[in-house]
Amino acid sequence: MFTDKINLALKIAAKAHQGQNRKGTDVPYIFHPVAVGMIISQYTNDEATIVAGILHDILEDVNPAVYSETDMRRDFVKDVSEPKTAGQPKLPWKERKESYLKRLGNSYYIEAYIVATADKIHNLTDILKDYDQFGDKIWHRFNASKQDILWYYRAVFSLIRNEPVPIELKRHLANLIEELKSIVTTNP
């Protein structure tokens, strides 16, 4: 389902993420928000939630001069993104993740949990695929140990577990976390 709003979100994301690549790869970053939107669209046809998935990293990763929270509110009216730290300096990895977990845990928008689940599914899918291809070399692209990365995904899942996120999405994320756990515990 490609509505005018979804098409607008895709255009904005493509422009905002132009020239960016996925961490440690040559894959254009735009693949990630598009994939998150596609994952969400498999479980809901709610336009605002799909748009939120496509735009979910813009406030965190894109210079506000390119696209700001004000622009997002103008273009999409309601707050379509999970809470981000727009315009704030980038904190160390652990502090960023703890802050994200706190904001997500305090969210009362079911859409934020759906977007977070789809985002983590795509991120973990890429991590596991890259691990299969490159082995332990992939951990160097992160500012955290693989044990900390596992901790983070488990913490996100613990927040999502009891929320009304489609059960298939939760199962998918849980299975990916188990795969990551197997890698981390087998090869610490």
Question: Could you describe each region identified by the protein language model?
Answer:
Residues 1-188:
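Active-site helical microenvironments for divalent-metal-assisted chemistry
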